[in-house]
Amino acid sequence: RETLDAVALLYMATQIASGMSYLEARNYIHRDLAARNCLVGDNKLVKVADFGLARLMRDDTYTAHAGAKFPIKW
């Protein structure tokens, strides 16, 4: 296992943020962003995966029903 320094972790975090921004620009909400859903490849290239809970946002706002177990759009 490779130890990751702060620079590598920041690089990976910015890739994840960029991927989430890409989804938001296309009106999608991932709803399950977690380390287990981030695939790391060669040269620490990160891909956001597992869109099983993803939803297309049709309105400008997104709300959850009572008792929902996922966060609303932040």
Swiss-Prot record:
Biological process terms in GO annotation: cell surface receptor protein tyrosine kinase signaling pathway
Xref: PROSITE patterns: PROTEIN_KINASE_DOM (PS50011), PROTEIN_KINASE_TYR (PS00109)
Molecular function GO labels: ATP binding; non-membrane spanning protein tyrosine kinase activity; transmembrane receptor protein tyrosine kinase activity
Protein kinase domain span: 1-74
UniProt KW ATP-binding keyword: yes
Motif segment (Kinase activation loop): 50-74
Domain of life per record: Eukaryota
Coiled-coil ranges per UniProt: none
Family membership noted in the UniProt record: Belongs to the protein kinase superfamily. Tyr protein kinase family. ABL subfamily.
A cellular component annotation (GO) from this entry: receptor complex
Organism: Calliphora vicina (Blue blowfly)
UniProt keyword Transmembrane helix, yes or no: no
Protein name: Tyrosine-protein kinase ABL
Gene this protein is translated from: ABL
SUPFAM superfamilies, A to Z: Protein kinase-like (PK-like)
Record PANTHER family: SERINE_THREONINE_TYROSINE KINASE 1, TYROSINE-PROTEIN KINASE RECEPTOR
Predominant place of localization: cytoplasm
Gene3D superfamilies assigned to the protein according to its UniProt record, in alphabetical order: Transferase(Phosphotransferase) domain 1 (1.10.510.10)
Recorded catalytic activity of this chain's protein: L-tyrosyl-[protein] + ATP = O-phospho-L-tyrosyl-[protein] + ADP + H(+)
Subcellular locations according to the entry: Cytoplasm
Active site: 32
InterPro entries for the chain: Kinase-like_dom_sf, Prot_kinase_dom, RTK, Ser-Thr/Tyr_kinase_cat_dom, Tyr_kinase_AS
Enzyme class of the recorded protein, top EC level: transferase
Alphabetized UniProt keyword annotations: ATP-binding, Cytoplasm, Kinase, Nucleotide-binding, Transferase, Tyrosine-protein kinase
